[in-house]
Amino acid sequence: MSLASRMTSVGGADNYGESDYGWDETVLGDMHLNSAINLDLFKEFLHIDPPVYKVKENHRLTEELRELQSLARKGSKIEIGFQRLFARMFPRDGNLIPMDSTMTRMIMKIIRDSGTKYKLGIPLLGISEEMIKKGAMVPSNLVYSFNCFLNIIYGRSEWIRSEGIAIRFKMYEHGRFIRRDLTISEKEYNFIVGKEVVEIRASRRKERFIADYNSLLLLLDVAGQRICAHLCSQLGEISGVPGSLSRYHLETLCTAGDRMIERCGNKAYEVLGMYEALCVGRLLENNPDGITDHTQFSANCEEELQELIAGSVEPAFMKSQVDLIKTTLEKMKNQDISNAFCLYRVWGHPTVDIYEGMKKVHTIGTKVKVIPPNLGTIMVCQFRKMFMSTFFKKHHRYPPITGTPGEYLERCLKDNVAIRIEHLAYNLRDFEFIRIGETYSVPDTFDMCHVLNDKAVSPDMSELLESIKNGKGTSCGAKRRGMLRWMEGDSLNCKSFLSDIDEKGLSEEDLLIGMYEKEREIKVAARMYSLMTERMRYYFVLTEGLIADYILPHFPEITMKDSLNVLLKKMWESGGQRSIGSMDVNINIDFSKWNTNMREGPTSDTFREMDGIFGFKRLIARTHEIFNASLVYSASGKYLPTIEDGRILDDPPMCYRGHLGGFEGLRQKGWTVATVCLLAYLSEQNKIQMKLMGQGDNQIIRLRMPTSYWDSLRLTEEMKKKEARILSDKFVHEMDIIFTGVGLPIKVRETWKSTRLFMYGKVMLLDGRQLPQWYKKTLRSYALSNEGTLTISGVIGTIATNMCAAGGGSEVPCVMYLFFLLLAEWSLEFMFRYHPFTRVGIKDGSSMEFRLNEKGGYVHKQTRKTNNLWLKSLLVLVPTAVGGSVTIPLTGFIMRGFPDKASEGYAWLKFLGSSKSPIQGFLKNFYTFLPNDTVEADMLVQSPFSLNHKRPPTPGLQTKENIREWLLSTPRFQQNRFIRSMQVLLSGFDKKSVCRELLTERMNPLISHEVYETFGHVYCEGIVARVENTRTIRTLHLSREDRKPIVAKLMTDEMAYIAYMWWRGNTKGEVFEECATKQARKGRNVGWKREIMGITTPHPLEVLFQSVCRPGDQCQRSDDYITSKLVDDGKFPPFLGSKIKNKVYSLQDEEARREPLIKTGARLARQFNWIGMGENMRGLVLKNVGSICDVSVFDKFVDDDPSDNLYTGSLMHRFTPSSVSEGCFINYAPQVGHKVFMSSDTLPSLSRGQTNYTFHFQAMYCFLQYSISKSGNEGSYHHHIMCQDCVVPVEDEFDDIPNETPSIVKAQEEQYVSIIRTTLGYIHTKPRSAMVLEDKSPIGRYIEDVEGHEKELYSGVVELLCWKSALEILGRTRDTHATVGTEDLQGWPRIYAYKVSRRHIIGKVTSFILYILAVQIGELPLPYSMERVSRRAIDVVSRVGLEGFSAVASLCLGRDIPMVNDVVTIVDGFAYPETVSVCLRSIKASILMTIGKVIRVDGFMSRRSVYPTESMTSDDFLRILGFKAVIFYGCTKIHEKCQLKGLDQVTYAEMMCHHRCLEKLLSSNLLTHMTMDRAMKYLPIKITKILPKISSTRPNTIAVTREVETENREFSDTFPIDERVTYPEMDLKTNQMIQYPTSSIYKWSDILLGIEHYDHVVVMGDGTGGTSMVAAHMFPNSTIYPMALLESKNLIPQDMESLAPPMSRKLTNVDSSLLIDLPDDIRKPTFRTRMLERVSLMRGNILIISDIEGTGTLFRDIVSTCLYMPTSTDVLMKTHLADLCGSYYMMKGAGRIRLRGSRLANLRYGEVFVSFRVTGGNIRPNRRGLGNCIQEVMIGLMNTQIETATGMLSQIESMFPLAADMSMNIAMMKMASWGGSFSRKVLGEDGLKLMGYVYQYINTHYHFASSSYRPGDNRTVTPRRKEDLTKLLCSIMLGVYGEDTETIEEVSKYTLIGSKKGVPGKSYFKVLMWKTGTKRALEHDEYMVGRAIRNYRTRILEAKKLDGPIGLPFHSGSLRKIATWGYKIPISASGGWIDNHLQI
């Protein structure tokens, strides 16, 4: 019966009845190449190079070949394989023909028009129709060849399926074959196609090419790939896509390879296999780094290439083509080479040689290797160390250890402190005689899904013998299907199975390993993969699963289990922006046959250690024992083993025993751990830090060079490069030695090094930028490129998915969407012409029928006549979530993971429908909602985000039900206990009814879904579904004769789907709202007939683009918005996306969370209160879990949280069930984000409020970052959040389900529960796991309600945060939050910083540091001993790296105002802008200086506090109370106990004293069950801005002002004015207290005191904020706008205040908007116009102040910019007389010009101030008048009294006390950076005492090296340290002695020297200050620090400066005196002792 008779039309309705049993359409055969090509059987039959092994005959193939030979002409030449036809059929063709791009151009116009309306600003909008037309051109021969091959393949399919002649494809029968004659590339070919064999005859040449059907598919595949490459290359090149190859380069590469194959045949692939290496070599050569040898890799490749070429048939020709490839690569840019690297499959694949592949495995795998036993010891010791260290870091304790540890390790275990490899006592041998005990136990309910897979397996021994005896060879048919074997056997108890293997091993019956050739490899010698027997496969799968789940998390270097986003983050951290200019060396290791070379010797101890961790004796350790005992054989089906005496004989290499190595993929994770251990060992031995990323044999090492150490040695750049070269070469050499020693040889020739190129897998990063590699996915993006049922939706989905993945490696993913459209249009064109699955075409203008569910039945629908262009457009545009196909909208190409696809779909349709187009009506119809008549509850529960559309029946649903019915009832599988049980179990589980009973009127489908998942029935049903969806089961079912039609039904469903799409586009539903978000929200409610909560999420396309203010736009909106700043040369850390973090705290047992079968129920149980789950639903969850587990065995399974304080966050944002994406992430190259700074600080109502809103911040950032980065206009963007329907408060409340509903009650009947327990197992005892920690809840007095205790709660929160931050600073571990970007301050959530005081944080952190260190040194943190404690603290904290302060820094981003002369010192403003490193340095300096000031710590602590217990342990609480007992009660007992046992070990009982100090504190320090996040909700946002100080008595200005004569004429003199004038002699800068960060405060205060009021003041060049601070105080009623050049673009992500100048950012009348809105550089072309736009919007009087530093042309730029402003704008600019006199004529249009001078300015540089008003016209300064004015101003300044000027300094300092305080703080910070941390008290001492203290400080902290010294030793005086300490001493001497000429002359001659033996006496004096004969130019900072110290001492403390000579130690002057203090030694008057003991 034909298909046509079963369809009423092209999309006909389903008319199958009972009589149709047994009839069906034939299954569509493969049209996708999915296996390796091996033609050994052809060679054997045709006697052409026949294989050397015994071949099993294939009778069907033989018959076809025999008939083919009979049809052939005599004398014709035969060749096996089609590869040599590439050059003939795909020659270089100058003729290009257009591909149909009508659909693409139409859609692009829609996107272009809509995107312009939306102000989307992406590159896609700039691609015109003409560009697409021009780009959519392909070589004509490729298109013609592809169509020919396609027709032949279609014809063969039609011939086989209809068992007749494929007439429509012009083919005719020819015996067992069909035939077609074609002309391809002007050559005639005869195609003779059979079911197995294909022959292509070149008519004129009398050549015959014979191969299998796969070889024909290869021809199609190569043609298809090349069409994809050409289309995307040409369009990409025209549209400027990075990585787009020119047509010339693409064709040159393809043609060179084709020619090589044509001349040398299959052997050419050996040379082409080097193509990727040539690309990498070219990249390395293009990018030398001066450290590594950038030519070495290419040279090594050249050697190998020459060997391969020499062995080829035509060496000279091969060399010429290889040279052509190399020459082509040389001409290409880096990004083009990277993309061309992905073309390695464009030449197809060779015919593989099975024998050679087996020979390689046998040769390497049986080679006996002598491996030194010590290497195995090293490996296992390193494994133990790494496992224990990471375990301790996570759990704060060690796993169980047995044996005898070494001395240092024993101490670490005893004291429970972290192992530090830098500790002097550390020794790896400490781990040699210990064993890690059982840490994890195998779950009783081990997940069955681990072993269920439809992959092939090897038959067992008896089955293989039987198959060979029966003449079936090694194929064994159904015995090879793993799924079928499992079903026909019995189900497996995983734990029992593993225990049995542990005891007995595998039986001989199971010891077989079949080898088969891997597909799609460019290797002639086949790459062999392994087929294990069923039980062997279970063994490896289960043990590898254990390693993956429990071992790998302790090795973060291994990336095997990392998700895509984690992998991206790791790659970006290793090779991203921070690697630019780095000397760190990337080493790309290439192991030689990594798996096969693995041997038992070095790994056995490590594997036994893994066994011990799981409580086994010899499980994983049996790996090599199994390999060695197994029969290894070729399982391709072509080899026939020999049997003798019932035993298979060895026939190496095709069949052998005694394999000593490993096999690919069989112990991958275990061997990866072993490899990582050896690499880590090498790193430690070489004392070099290493960043490692690895999986299997792909190991990438980044050696971190000790550059800071080299800096300390003052090495030059060249010397550093030399050291880096030596270190990296040494590392590679030692790596080669050690891996060769363990039998894993490294291909040193193919291992390459580079500091610039980073490559992991196939992903490349060069100089911190990800290189494009989109060809890899592009080549697989056409209709026949992937396996599976060939459907329209599947084709579109495949192409969309591939091109979306291509976008992830591109800087322009939106253009990848254009490629998707074009490639989809091409595929749809030939699919519409003839659909190979349905066997019919889709005719334009035809009508179609299909049926819909309506009113409980089916209704037939007739469509209008089709327009195929519009139908194709709908198929590619409309996503499935809104009723379309499996496509991906443009938005999905830009970011991944947006959860609500319906909301995204409606936003996309609204976007497309916003512009006029031929399909606008269709798109608007799809935007409407057509509800389904029925509510399918199971669809809602199982697909929580879905909409209930009116759609045709789900394709294949009835077929699946039929398969399941047969599967569960057929006797064939009844011996399988699981299958047998399922028939009964699922009969009692009515899925639809159960789901219906889970629905409520107001519901959250995600919760219902999770509750549904807790049913044991659902887990079992999932296994059944997994089984029934396998290819094996589908094939078995299709082979039944007693079934209903399946294929024909699917064919009808396919056509019905197409018909529905056209009908739906013509049918209008209901528009609920114009807002897409609300349309989705209401669509859900209407469709499901209930209120759906917690699902609908606004998409950025809908929310962010309704009101966009771009650079230059006038923004007058006051509503919330996201601020973004685009800087073309930006270096901002990119936002990569973030993972959703659940914020529910739970004490639930760890074992309950890890049990796979109850983990869903366990998650719900610990979140009951947060979810707000009703009692009935809770009961159902617990009852469902109870069917698998007795929850009473756990100490805590359900969290009781009556106060609701154990969680924060809404369900919508934080609930992460399995059905939801783990987060939102970018889908483009990360460097795109460098140009964009984004912040939600201008979105306070959503980002800092107490209410949760339906706003997806991660999605907004991901989308905005891309949109803005590509907009092209520098400046700021405001994306206003306008729609009140989109972003609404989250509603999490939902209804409870009814109690005791019938279907649920039935499902939980005892008979079904019993089956679940029998099938899956039952947990009746608590699983053993050493991971579980004891309950650490603090002991104390708890309160439930914190109302009325807000102040105490604030104290407790701050104390707890500070305690944890202090521990982190001092090297303790703490679980930190995952960072959002690549460099951020997210140690604590950003919101915390807005609610706590920076002063409190720094004060309390300092207190805790002092306490902890006081305990360590045996002192009390009380005033009488504080000096010693402080010194120790300064020592320790000084040595902590910046990363140690990340947690405390994240708490200080609120930046409240510091207090003057406060004990808590806050260092602010020493650099602009505030980068992460600047912030960390300032926090570190603040803590150091606060330590130096602290005398009493009790002032920082509160006697009464309330602590949130769920964020602290009992240890935390106890230590904090212990500290309070000491400082408030002076309790010495507690302190003594802490000293005796250590802070970590002391207990409650031991801290009790007879004064009852602890009891008192326990009564006043309360606890509350609350998380830190919840506690923060109770704290208000701090007000951090202050009003500017308005002084009642403002001083009078001492500035001198003169008006400049002007003239009005068009042309002016351009002769310079002679500016030679006499300046006042005295420079008052030396008397200024404010030196840092700027002293401009003085001069601007003086100048502005004489200026009248303005409404708006713009201050240019004000990075420090000093000038704007002065202006804010001088004009308190004005708005001040600071502007500055961003000297660094590496800002703190999302932190607006890091852009604001630090000195003025907290003043209420300072507005930083111009900093955001305008380009940061006045010289940028757009600056002037943008400035004019903003200034024009200001109302009132306007003053522009310029404090920009610079001379020459910059003066002209400033003047011309200011004169460009609106008339009547006043300007006041700082300049220099030289610039003014040389360029005065530029001031055309300036009136009311005044010249101002101040005695407080830098007069020695001629610094003056010019003010003028912008008038326009020809007014300008008169040359002579300006010259006279200059003379008058200078005379006036000379007449200003010095006393008047110095008095003015004091008055200004009193106006700005914070600035004076800040200056001293920064000066002290500068001293700390030079190596000396001194308190103000010390700096205020008598001059001699201060010098003596500093001298003693240096001698107690530093020493000259006696011999060698190591990196990280901060006490050794290296050359750099010597320079810094010399600066320190010189600046202090300037501060003590003054800054007169004689002092400077003397100070500049001093340096540090070292005494070899020291001065004998009571103490050793080894570092001396010595005067040399050589003067050193003192640096500017030395003067500034000296002045700060001197003015602090003389003007604040009124100390006197020292007089007299400085002298020499022990010899003369001041140094003679201070050298004797504390050193009772004889002093020689001549100083002879010193002369004999000095070391320079």
UniProtKB/Swiss-Prot annotation:
UniProt-listed Enzyme Commission number(s): 2.7.7.48, 3.6.1.-, 2.7.7.88, 2.1.1.375
Residue ranges of domain Mononegavirus-type SAM-dependent 2'-O-MTase in the record: 1632-1811
InterPro entries recorded: L_poly_C, Mononeg_mRNAcap, Mononeg_RNA_pol_cat, Mononega_L_MeTrfase
Key words, A-Z: ATP-binding, Host cytoplasm, Hydrolase, Methyltransferase, mRNA capping, mRNA processing, Multifunctional enzyme, Nucleotide-binding, Nucleotidyltransferase, RNA-directed RNA polymerase, S-adenosyl-L-methionine, Transferase, Viral RNA replication, Virion
Keyword Transmembrane helix among record annotations: no
Domain RdRp catalytic, chain residue ranges per copy: 583-768
Annotated signal sequence range: none
Reactions catalysed, as given in the entry: RNA(n) + a ribonucleoside 5'-triphosphate = RNA(n+1) + diphosphate; a 5'-end (5'-triphosphoguanosine)-adenylyl-adenylyl-cytidylyl-adenosine in mRNA + 2 S-adenosyl-L-methionine = a 5'-end (N(7)-methyl 5'-triphosphoguanosine)-(2'-O-methyladenylyl)-adenylyl-cytidylyl-adenosine in mRNA + 2 S-adenosyl-L-homocysteine + H(+); a 5'-end (5'-triphosphoguanosine)-adenylyl-adenylyl-cytidylyl-adenosine in mRNA + S-adenosyl-L-methionine = a 5'-end (5'-triphosphoguanosine)-(2'-O-methyladenylyl)-adenylyl-cytidylyl-adenosine in mRNA + S-adenosyl-L-homocysteine + H(+); GTP + H2O = GDP + phosphate + H(+)
One of the record's GO molecular function terms: ATP binding
GO-annotated cellular components: host cell cytoplasm; virion component
Protein's UniProt keywords contain Transferase: yes
Compartments it resides in: Virion; Host cytoplasm
Chief location category: virion
Purpose of the protein: Displays RNA-directed RNA polymerase, mRNA guanylyl transferase, mRNA (guanine-N(7)-)-methyltransferase and poly(A) synthetase activities. The viral mRNA guanylyl transferase displays a different biochemical reaction than the cellular enzyme. The template is composed of the viral RNA tightly encapsidated by the nucleoprotein (N). Functions either as transcriptase or as replicase. The transcriptase synthesizes subsequently subgenomic RNAs, assuring their capping and polyadenylation by a stuttering mechanism.
Family: Belongs to the varicosavirus protein L family.
Protein name stated in the entry: RNA-directed RNA polymerase L
Gene: L
